[in-house]
């Protein structure tokens, strides 16, 4: 159970990320929209309010990028919910890299490539019974320079996973990370994820410390 849980916790960092892109116009200035939420508790309605609150500080290109990247985040989320590995990774660039935060097992953090992510994510999906509608992955801030967008993401992930004996267990986790997305012939692709902050892990409603 512990090995399974650690895998699940690791894959949280990857996020069930995605979105859908078009748009050829990019801001040439490097401008960051400040996050408006500290400890995030952002549902569907709050997502709209968050984006609206940021709109005044964003250029038209940044607003378009925000919408398109969020849509791709949502599409990869739906792939995860459907246990479709290809869909869950569809908008990851070939050179995608995940940088995890330091922990007791990895004092300097880990650097994980797309091929390794595919292995971890398959294990995660194989152990997944269901994903709760409470799960939400939202952009909190965005900046652009040329065809590169840097976004801060917060994910609240609620799912039911299979224990070692096949029994179901509810897991609640949250993570905040910085992502870079690059605009290509395929639209926006997720190039890197840097873990910034991990929230508490709850297993069947109780704190869990791996």
PLM region descriptions:
Residues 8-19:
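Bacterial N-terminal signal peptides
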Residues 28, 35-37, 42, 115-167:
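Surface-exposed, charged secondary-structure patches
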Residues 1-4:
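Positively charged n-region of N-terminal signal peptides that target proteins for export
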Residues 7-8, 25:
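Cleavable N-terminal signal peptides
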Residues 26-94:
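Short, low-complexity N-terminal intrinsically disordered segments enriched in polar/charged residues
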Residues 97-112, 129:
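A short gly/proline-enriched turn/hairpin at secondary-structure junctions
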């Amino acid at each position: 159970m512990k090995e399974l849980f650690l895998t699940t916790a690791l894959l949280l960092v990857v996020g069930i990320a995605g979105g859908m892109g078009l748009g050829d116009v990019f801001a040439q200035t490097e401008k960051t929209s400040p996050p408006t939420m500290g400890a995030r508790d952002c549902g569907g309605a709050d997502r709209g309010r968050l984006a609206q609150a940021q709109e005044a500080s964003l250029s038209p290109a940044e607003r378009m990028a925000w919408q398109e990247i969020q849509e791709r985040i949502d599409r990869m989320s739906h792939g995860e919910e459907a246990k479709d590995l290809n869909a869950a990774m569809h908008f990851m660039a070939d050179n995608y890299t995940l940088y995890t935060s330091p922990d007791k097992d990895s004092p300097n953090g880990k650097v994980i490539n797309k091929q390794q992510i595919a292995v971890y994510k398959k294990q995660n999906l194989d152990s997944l019974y269901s994903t709760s509608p409470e799960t939400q992955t939202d952009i909190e801030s965005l900046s652009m320079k040329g065809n590169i967008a840097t976004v801060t993401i917060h994910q609240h992930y609620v799912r039911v996973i299979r224990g070692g004996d096949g029994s179901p267990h509810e897991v609640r986790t949250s993570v905040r990370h910085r992502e870079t997305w690059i605009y290509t012939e395929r639209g926006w692709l997720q190039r890197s994820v840097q873990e910034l902050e991990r929230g508490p892990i709850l297993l069947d409603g109780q704190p869990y410390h791996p």
